[in-house]
Amino acid sequence: MKALGIDHGDKRMGIAASDDLGMLAHPLEFILAEPYEAFLTRLRTIMAERQIEQIVVGMPRNMDGSYGPQALKVRDFVATLKNSVVVPVQTWDERLTSVAAEK
């Protein structure tokens, strides 16, 4: 299943796409977060070009599992995004992903 990954930022969104098997992700580009309609237009174009079947958004939870200020922003973004696209949107817990990537 082809997936699109979004790394949410206040000013820019990092976009990555999976390979055809949905196993490896490759960075694509950054899209300005505002205005939202321009972001959404570019996102939909990428989705159509790459035949994306799902979106995964990184969720920056605290180490204790709680939601900090940035995670609350991501949660709100995901809720809006789910109403803006026709594919499933899910979150991925980002705790320790930077540590794992360094190894």
Predicted stretch roles:
Residues D7:
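Conserved catalytic-loop position in the HRD/HxD motif
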Residues K2-A3, K11-K103:
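Phosphate- and other anionic-substrate recognition elements at nucleic-acid/protein interfaces
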